[in-house]
Structure formats: structure tokens, C-alpha cells
Amino acid sequence: MPLTDEQFEQYQRDGYVVVEDCLDGATVEAVTERIDAYVRNDRDATQFERMLEPDAEDAALGDADPVRKFEGVGMVREDDVFAELVRDEAIVDVVRQLQGPNLHLLRSAAMLKPPRVGSEKKFHQDAAYYPIHPMDHVTVWVALDQSTTENGCMQVVPGAHTDGLLGHEAVEYDTDIAISEADYTPEDAVALPMEPGDVLFQHCLLPHYTAPNETEDWRRAFIAAYMRSRSRFTDQNPPEWVDSYDVTGDSFRGCV
């Protein structure tokens, strides 16, 4: 179901909108169970990356590895459960409203915060990872668990997407980057507690942050970033890891 006029205006003004109960329980359960299978190594991830919490001991969670994230568009190529999710009409209808009828997937990831050891994600803009024009792609954040301030819910800086792309710097582990040009703190942000099946639609230039997970429960979410099929790389030599996947509508020669 598309956004209401009020929700659409909020997205344009604030750079985000949360749609409650966007996905049904069966969909949430299927995605959660599939992610858990990869966490337990019951399924092999051959077309996407698996990253662990940098400071957690391997045995911190017993039979489950302290996985921080699975990353790569290969997630939807390799696994039908993830492919069905990124094509779910409840999500795609909203993205069409924001981006138009021709859509490619730019990113897919499972963002996890394991109990007690889930680390923070510093303030950043998703657009900083991707040399894409126009710089307006939509990040979709699907809550698979109850997401709270205690376990690391999304926190955003409303309206800051209008400031454009800010300078970023690399952080000390994996592929993370953090905003260096502005000094945001959690006091600048609005926390977005969410229930399983709620979906956050977020402008790629919106600064956001998640705190560590200090609870005894997992905080799991699935991310899908959608761009217009006419999008182009702004760099002649884009990063090798940048990928795309046709979601709906037409594709265009010379575009991403």
C-alpha cells in the first residue's frame, strides 16, 4: 500500500518514514529463520560476505557465531527468501512512489546486533558508500525483532538529508565509515523503536546511528537499498563491490 499524503510529506521533509505493520508475520518469520540458518552455519553463503563482531569471542553466543552482518546483492541471487522480500509489493509500492516505476536493487544486507556484544554503528550516510547519481536512493530497513533504544534501534537526524553529502572517514574495522565533517551525537537524533514487520524508508543522505546491544536478545534487521534504473556511477571506475539487481520496470543501457 502506498504512503498516505502525510507520510509522503514526512519523507520529503524529514528524510524518513516508518510504516507500521508493513509486512505480515509469515514473511518476517521466514526471513528471520533464514538469517538464523546462516548464523548457525546450517547454510553456506557463497555469493555474499559474512562479517563477525570485531571484539567478540567466537564462543560468546554458544552455538551461534557473533555475526555482525551479511552483505551483498548476492543474497537475493542466492536465496529465494531474500529475493521474495526485496520484491514484496508492500515495500516496492512505497519505493515506486518515492523513486518511480523502474527500480534496481543497489544493496542488500542483514544487519545484526548479537546479544551483549552487538557493537554500535557510528553516524554515517548511506550515500557515502556509493558513487551514484542521482543521490536519492532509498534505504529500506525491515525490523525482524522488537527494536529498542536498549538493543540498538535506528536513530536518525530529521531533515539533515537536505545538507547534502558530508565528509566521511574510515573506522577501524571491516568496511565501515563515519561522518567526519559534522559532530553528531545521540542527542541530535530521534530514536525509532520498531516492532517486527515495521519498515523504515530512509533517504540515502540522512545521517543515522545505532547504539550497542546491551540486552540478552538479538536485534536483527534486513536492509534493501533501491535506486532508479536510470542511475549512473559518478566515478569512471566505481568500486568493484558495487552491484545491482533488477527489481521492477525497465532497465536502460549505460546505467547502473
Please provide the spans of the model-predicted regions.
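Generic beta-strand structural signal
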Residues: 101-108, 119-121, 136-142, 152, ...
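Short acidic/polar capping segments at secondary-structure boundaries
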Residues: 110-117, 128, 135-136, 144-149, ...
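Short, P/G- and charge-enriched loop/turn segments at secondary-structure junctions
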Residues: 126-129, 187-189
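Double-stranded beta-helix
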Residues: 147-209, 231-234, 250-251
